């Protein structure tokens, strides 16, 4: 039984599915997708549960969410292993994901009060009050790269605000989704407040097409995000929050410490085997001897990276990609760029056929025309050389995406220029592109999102504002508007 609907675990009536470890092919999870009728049922019970949940005092909702945080802490080792085995990422990195999930609780509570909550301003004749109300029934679509943390970033603030939810994990990480929902069950969520439907494209389409949804919160690829945007077009009454990918530039302008710059680049481009939406995809390196030395050192150190199993000892820096098919897609993208005229500096290599273990690749594309403006979700770094900083900014902005952008430089003035001219939601200076703070908004412009950033701003798309002018009693104003006459007329 792999679906959780109205507080009950039930068997899906859709397609049979199984999930294997992307390196060992060990079967980890088996179950059936939710069919359209079960998806509709999940929405119906969420609708029925909404009025009571929304009317709970905030403290009551907060108590359940904090109980969930305590359960995450108590089961950290178990959830770490589930995430690591299912995604292929090393144990150390999966542990950091669970830690981020735990920290998200306190941050979301603070954000609720700071961004939404209730605020009152006293007036001479009463008060002006700002309140926030939940939307209703929301669908949450989760990604596979952070199958616990990223859905958590939607689910927690949405529940705190008083919404009820239908959660569809990625079909590539059903085990993590199920494990997390079991912790929510133990936290004491009332039946119907949060529902789990497993499945792939058909389940997702059935969910996103429901008329009774009040909104959809999505993290994933731009192609799927655009499809959802088209599907919900003409429905302005529904909230749609899209957190999509990027073709992110990292500018290497002035290298005071070569190894530090190489380390920053490795963290930006290859952590999580390149499967973070903020990963550097385009490396812009200034022409000259300093840039040459930096690139040579980068190729040297990156060439030593050996992906490994989730439980290897010692632990590898990177594990496998989410699937062997994902690794093959990266290889095809590299060959395509070679065919366009790219010069390979470090060839990616499959460690073992049939697995998702893939070494990083680096290819120079300076002067190459018609390079696809796409997010290759894996450890492939494209290099361009530039002559001056204005050219670097032009290259950085030469994309339909706008998620993250970074600069390595000792010159603060250059960073100030980048802040003014960069088209990206995250702009870092001498910090990895993959570094982001939950106390700040997380999101991008262009094809990277629809101006609904998550993290600290997630509270904004989980509730709508209600403004009120209030007075405990009704009185006639001392001064009337022109043309109004309330004088008593004598009877004739």
From Swiss-Prot:
Main enzyme class: oxidoreductase
Residues that, per the record, bind NAD(+): 220-225
GO MF: succinylglutamate-semialdehyde dehydrogenase activity
Reactions catalysed according to its record: N-succinyl-L-glutamate 5-semialdehyde + NAD(+) + H2O = N-succinyl-L-glutamate + NADH + 2 H(+)
GO biological process: arginine catabolic process to glutamate; arginine catabolic process to succinate
Active-site feature positions: 243, 277
Classification via Gene3D superfamilies: Aldehyde Dehydrogenase, Chain A, domain 1 (3.40.605.10), Aldehyde Dehydrogenase, Chain A, domain 2 (3.40.309.10)
Sorted UniProt keywords: Arginine metabolism, NAD, Oxidoreductase
Pathway(s) served: Amino-acid degradation; L-arginine degradation via AST pathway; L-glutamate and succinate from L-arginine: step 4/5
Enzyme nomenclature, EC number: 1.2.1.71
Physiological role: Catalyzes the NAD-dependent reduction of succinylglutamate semialdehyde into succinylglutamate.
Similarity-based family: Belongs to the aldehyde dehydrogenase family. AstD subfamily.
Protein name: N-succinylglutamate 5-semialdehyde dehydrogenase
Organism this protein belongs to: Salmonella gallinarum (strain 287/91 / NCTC 13346)
